[in-house]
Amino acid sequence: MPGLPEVAPGDDLAKLIAAVEPGLVDGDVLLVTSKIVSKAEGRIVRADDREAAIDAETVRVVARRGALRIVENRQGLVMAAAGVDASNTPSGTVLLLPEDPDASARAIRDGLRDTLGVDVGVVVTDTFGRPWRTGLTDVAIGAAGVRVLDDLRGGTDAYGNPLSATVVATADELAAAGDLVKGKAAGLPVAVVRGLPHVIAGDDEAGARAMVRGGRDDMFRLGTSEAVREAVTQRRTVRAFTDEPVDPGAVRRAVAAAVTAPAPHHTTPWRFVLLESAESRTRLLDAMRDAWIADLRGDRKTEESIAKRVRRGDVLRNAPYLVVPCMVMDGSHSYGDARRDAAEREMFVVATGAGVQNFLVALAGERLGSAWVSSTMFCRDVVRRALGLPESWEPMGAVAVGHAAEEPRDRPARDAGAFIEVR
């Protein structure tokens, strides 16, 4: 659509479009670049405020590489620099995305209906990069009067095969098609698609916000480096689980991660006993409970106090899956004096702890909750008898594993300075 003037803050885009006599008819779809929408809405800031503007528009950082930030903005869009852009704007300024692109699209649609009496769809477009693909394309960030998604699930293809996952991003396809004629530097910020009346919808149709995938469904929520860092802090102690079964394959993958931990003398001091049957879990927990009660009675605790303490073990009893990590000291050195022999054992204990931590972190990566409980360390002989383990295996607690009954709360970051001494 040639002939549009330079857009300034306060301009009515519908009137500007109508003024160039575009010959619009019912069923047309207007593809409007977000740049002119931002200009009309006064979303212009000084270029030296760019970083502050990105900060203000950012909800979370998805990935960072040097000065480049891929972020999620307040509309849920994941894009470079929160869409703050220095192109197609006067030198010394940058443009922010429209505050509410769907509302912007509705305003243009309503304005054209009032001015020209036509029923058209409007898609506000912006340029996005894409994971796994080189190059840019336009996508829909706002829409009105357009079926933004075409859900084909439940139908069949030409061969009669069921369609179970096909949801076509119609608004994005329209945006990309429009970019072929608008270009990035041709001074043509609006294009018209004609001949697709089936994509036109009523005023109550969802806008482009419906195309934003929610966090719980996002398999690629973080960049690679960010995901690796966050995986460590995702681990939580989970004490309540659902009845959903635990995938044994996920636990075995976590064990594979666990045994990459550092260990002394090129040894492998970890063993993980997987209690996958209810019978084995009950046998162990009953034996440990009896040993605990005997210890508490030896401490002259009251029966009421004993019952209260024993209930703390319910986190293990209520878990659908248990793992008993054990330390083995095969390959350890004997020095013949207490000081060095104690240090040798401590090395193996530290290595076992590193393996257990790897295991817990990997479980979190598998979306499994866990709780490490120390109890098996207080009755190792009992545990070995109940599980038929060799005398050389030293139980180092137990890990309850399952699907968390509720989403763990965010944990505030700790100030590392409180734990650091520099010399």
UniProtKB/Swiss-Prot annotation:
Enzyme Commission number(s) of this protein: 6.3.2.31, 6.3.2.34, 1.3.8.17
tRNA-binding keyword on record: no
Cofactor note: Binds 2 divalent metal cations per subunit. The ions could be magnesium and/or manganese. Monovalent cation. The ion could be potassium.
Pathway: Cofactor biosynthesis; coenzyme F420 biosynthesis
GO molecular function: coenzyme F420-0:L-glutamate ligase activity; coenzyme F420-1:gamma-L-glutamate ligase activity; GTP binding; metal ion binding; oxidoreductase activity, acting on the CH-CH group of donors, with a flavin as acceptor
Residues noted as binding coenzyme F420-(gamma-Glu)n in the record, renumbered to the chain: D295
Region (Dehydro-coenzyme F420-0 reductase): 224-423
Residues where a divalent metal cation 2 binds: T127
Segments forming a coiled coil: none
GO biological process, alphabetically ordered: F420-0 metabolic process
Residue segments, region Coenzyme F420:L-glutamate ligase: 1-223
Catalytic activity: oxidized coenzyme F420-0 + GTP + L-glutamate = oxidized coenzyme F420-1 + GDP + phosphate + H(+); oxidized coenzyme F420-0 + FMN + H(+) = dehydro coenzyme F420-0 + FMNH2; oxidized coenzyme F420-1 + GTP + L-glutamate = oxidized coenzyme F420-2 + GDP + phosphate + H(+)
Family affiliation: In the N-terminal section; belongs to the CofE family.
Role summary: Bifunctional enzyme that catalyzes the GTP-dependent successive addition of two or more gamma-linked L-glutamates to the L-lactyl phosphodiester of 7,8-didemethyl-8-hydroxy-5-deazariboflavin (F420-0) to form polyglutamated F420 derivatives, and the FMNH2-dependent reduction of dehydro-F420-0 to form F420-0.
Name of this chain's protein: Bifunctional F420 biosynthesis protein FbiB
GN (gene name): fbiB
